[in-house]
Structure formats: structure tokens, C-alpha cells
Amino acid sequence: MNIKTGDTVVVIAGGDQFAVDKKGVKTRKTGRVLKIDRVKNTVIVEGVNIVKKHQRPTSANDKGGIVEIPAPIHASNVAILDPKTNTPTRIGHRIENGVKVRYAKKSGQTLDKAAKPAKTKAEKVEKAATSSTDKPAKVTKAAKEAKPVKAVKSQKVEKNTSVQKKGASGK
């Protein structure tokens, strides 16, 4: 799937592809991709395919009622908008500065943000060699947030070692 979260897409198929304004002009619905489900091959687009969900009052949501939320639509029903021409376009992949990026096939403009060039294997090995000798070990976030453990005083437990001797009578 060539779509990523945050892309601006237009609905090209399905029942929710057009919006009609006050003058009666049909325009295709567009929106930003909020979530992607790669298993089901669906996307959730902001402002598209809005459904009404009846919600019961819960402890987190004191008031119940009818809530409008966007429902997923199939990824084949949307196309990415070309940032230059503002029309639906297909996506291609190419390598720029050693990094694989997506580009719009209509205008040729790169869709991904400018990424840092990929480091060569020699640079990675050199960096690993210098970082291991110069810098101390990294402290993880969990280690920073961990509270020190208080020492617990050990209490001596006295054992009852006195054994009553039985008398001659056996009592």
C-alpha cells in the first residue's frame, strides 16, 4: 500500500465520494489519512464516511448519546492528491540521496519529506567504534524514571527452641 498516515487523499469510488454544496455543484471529498489498517487494506480519512454511533454512558464518558465518527473505507477507493496540480495521482518510488522516496507520477514531485542520506557501512562501523570508547553507556528512559528501592531492615525472628521434657509420668 502506497498510502501513509498524514497523506491528503481524495475519494475516487464508493457511495461517499461526492459532496454537494448549496449551489448544487458536486465536488469530490478530500481529507487527511488518520489511520491505516494494513491487514484489512482500509484507511480512515478525516471527514469522509462519517457514521453515527450510539454510545452508552460510561465512567469515562459521563454522557451517552449519538457520536459521529469516521468509518474505514477500502484503500483502493482513495487516491493521493498531487501536491502540485491538486489532482488524484498514482505513486511511484525512486531513490534520492540514497533514500527510497515516493513521488507523484503526474508532476514528478516528491511526496515524502526530505530524508537524511543513508550512511554507508563503513560510516556505521566507524561511528560504532568511536562511540563505544568515548561515551558512557546510555541510560534508558525506564532507568531514569525508576525509583530507588528502599533497604528493608531484616528482622530477627526468634525461634522457640525450648522443648518441654516429658516427665516420668508421660504427661
UniProtKB/Swiss-Prot annotation:
Annotated GO MF terms: rRNA binding; structural constituent of ribosome
Entry keyword annotation includes Zinc: no
Location of the region described as Unknown in the Swiss-Prot/TrEMBL record: 125-171
GO cellular component: ribonucleoprotein complex; ribosome
Pfam families: ribosomal_L24
UniProt superkingdom: Bacteria
Region described as Disordered: 108-171
Signal peptide: none
Record's keyword terms, sorted: Ribonucleoprotein, Ribosomal protein, RNA-binding, rRNA-binding
Large ribosomal subunit protein uL24: region residues: 1-124
SUPFAM superfamilies listed in its UniProt record: Translation proteins SH3-like domain (SSF50104)
Annotated GO biological process: translation
InterPro entries according to UniProt: Rib_uL2_dom2, Ribosomal_uL24, Ribosomal_uL24_KOW, Translation_prot_SH3-like_sf
Family in the record: Belongs to the universal ribosomal protein uL24 family.
UniProt xrefs under NCBIfam families: rplX_bact
Role this protein plays: One of two assembly initiator proteins, it binds directly to the 5'-end of the 23S rRNA, where it nucleates assembly of the 50S subunit.
Subunit and partners: Part of the 50S ribosomal subunit.
Protein name (Swiss-Prot/TrEMBL): Large ribosomal subunit protein uL24
Native source organism of the sequence: Acholeplasma laidlawii (strain PG-8A)
Gene from which the chain derives: rplX
